[in-house]
From Swiss-Prot:
This is Sucrose transport protein SUC5. The lineage of its organism: Eukaryota, Viridiplantae, Streptophyta, Embryophyta, Tracheophyta. It comes from Arabidopsis thaliana. GO terms for molecular function: biotin transmembrane transporter activity; sucrose transmembrane transporter activity; symporter activity. The gene is SUC5. Residues 1-27 are annotated as: Disordered. The chain crosses the membrane at residues 34-54, 68-88, 103-123, 141-161, 180-200, 226-246, 282-302, 334-354, 364-384, 407-427, 441-461, 474-494.
Length: 512
């Protein structure tokens, strides 16, 4: 039976690759259309930046202890492992007259709107349903918040996969255009990050919408609510302008496929069978991606909490002065993330030329992972310096100007490896899948699984690990530094180089 099962899995893999293959789109689309679709990333990332910088502290203010807050982030990888491969699979086969990708992108925007409402009004609805304001734990608000948080992760996964697959369709198999498209996507992610983190660091944003501040919703909550209003407005503008401007050709299955349609439904056993029988370049890419994101997720999920706790010495569960210090640290962390995103945006624009000068995409990715390793290791030095300063100046003194400068420099420099991480792995996945005949949506969905698995590992382990060492964030950051170094070595040694660029086509010059 083992041989038969292996043969069946191989057939499933072949079927998935063949049926997911994008239609022959001809020549690559003009750069202006690629830029238009890539701009959707700004709207998506605005909300994601708010989620990363403000929601971990906010859930603690609603009453979830720090050591349990990491489990909240399990929503993301679980929904990512389920949603994005399904969306990718079906967007490869969608026969809608609106195209393959656009219906899923529009559905994702609708889900974002619902989730933003639930998150922003969680405290108000919880109070209406019976939460007592004097209670430390607001159970109903937490349930509503977590529901919205889950929906937001589902919405982001519904949006991002088809967006990247749409870009790959527009590149039409041209390796250089594919890298440029992903660099544009990374650039607009940086734009969204800058806007999101800037909004999150501004303490009086709620004055734009005075109604956001209520009896159950204090200034921090009102600022959060206002930020999400701005987020959904931007997302609606960029998404619908892009979907109106860039047409998505209606797809029809090749002759003979219609009869097999009912037998080729998506099952997770088949997709994991496809992973087992993927070509070596894609397998190596998935391995390096898993280890790389084990390095990234501790910092991405807990950077603002680290600023509030370890750097500023605040406590979300402490007295009013400790809470105020914690909030100041969170806002400073959002400002640091804004600096990070500014550099990320500039680096994204130069990924193509930097990669050429460094000898290729895989060498560039490998080298910047060592920058990530050094940066994460430096969090130990920053934390110890902040603790030493508080021993001298007092527990509520806050960090010195020198420590603040060091922290902001650290946040900024980490924008370099993050720009590469947001671009090169996705470009390589598109290139490898094109060469093997696999569909863009399915391949990017599988890559998303390689990103979700590390987040699950970090979410499960970081809380208990940090609790074993006193409740801070440093143990997870140190593990991340080690993983970053390992991923750098693997990227340089085992990851295959992508094939040469596709030859130029007569229609590839439509850049005006």
């Amino acid at each position: 039976m083992g041989a038969l099962e292996a043969e069946r899995a191989a057939n499933n893999a072949t079927a998935l690759e063949t049926q997911s293959s994008p239609e022959d789109l001809g020549q690559p689309s003009p750069l202006r259309k690629i830029i238009s679709v890539a701009s959707i990333a700004a709207g998506v990332q605005f909300g994601w930046a708010l989620q990363l910088s403000l929601l971990t502290p906010y859930i603690q203010l609603l009453g979830i202890p720090h050591k349990w807050s990491s489990y909240m982030w399990l929503c993301g990888p679980i929904s990512g492992m389920i949603v994005q491969p399904i969306v990718g699979y079906h967007s490869d086969r969608c026969e809608s007259r609106f195209g393959r990708r656009r219906p899923f992108i529009a559905a994702g925007v609708a889900l974002v709107a619902v989730s933003v409402f639930l998150i922003g009004f969680a405290a108000d609805m919880g109070h209406s349903f019976g939460d007592k304001l004097e209670n430390k734990v607001r159970t109903r608000a937490i349930i509503i918040f977590l529901t919205g948080f889950w929906f937001l992760d589902v919405a982001n996964n519904t949006l991002q996969g088809p967006c990247r697959a749409f870009l790959a369709d527009l590149a039409a198999g041209d390796a250089k255009k594919t890298r440029v498209a992903n660099a544009c996507f990374s650039f607009f992610m940086a734009v969204g990050n800058v806007l999101g983190y800037a909004a999150g660091s501004y303490t009086n944003l709620h004055k734009m919408f005075p109604f956001t501040m209520t009896k159950a919703c204090d200034i921090y909550c009102a600022n959060l609510k206002t930020c999400f209003f701005l987020s959904i407005t931007l997302l609606l503008i960029v998404t619908f302008s892009s979907l109106w401007y860039v047409k998505d050709k209606q797809w029809s299955p090749p002759q003979g496929d219609k009869e097999e349609k009912t037998s080729s439904l998506f099952f997770f056993g088949e997709i994991f069978g496809a992973v087992r029988h993927m070509k070596r370049p894609m397998v190596m890419l998935l391995i390096v991606t898993v280890i790389n994101w084990i390095a990234w997720f501790p910092f991405i999920l807990y950077d603002t909490d680290w600023m509030g706790r370890e750097v500023y010495g605040g406590n979300s569960d402490g007295d009013e002065r400790s809470k105020k210090l914690y909030d100041q640290g969170v806002q400073a962390g959002a400002l640091g993330l804004m600096f990070n995103s500014i550099l990320l945006g500039f680096v994204s624009l130069g990924v193509e030329s930097i990669g050429r000068k460094m000898g290729g995409a895989k060498r560039l990715w490998g080298c910047v992972n060592f920058i990530l390793a050094i940066g994460l290791a430096m969090t130990v030095l920053v934390t110890k310096s902040a603790e030493h300063h508080r021993e001298i100046a007092g527990p509520l003194a806050g960090p010195s100007s020198g420590i603040k400068a060091g922290v902001f420099s650290l946040f900024t420099v980490l924008g370099i490896p993050l720009a590469i991480t947001y671009s090169i792995p996705f470009a390589l996945a598109s290139i490898f899948s094109t060469n093997s005949g696999a569909g863009q949506g399915l391949s990017l969905g599988v890559l998303n699984i390689a990103i979700c698995i590390p987040q699950m590992i970090v979410s499960f382990s970081s809380g208990p690990l940090d609790a074993q060492f006193g409740g801070g964030n440093l143990p997870s950051f140190v593990v991340g530094a080690i993983a970053a170094a390992v991923s750098g070595v693997l990227a340089l040694t085992v990851l295959p180089s992508p094939p040469p660029d596709a030859p130029a086509m007569s229609g590839a010059m439509g850049f005006h």
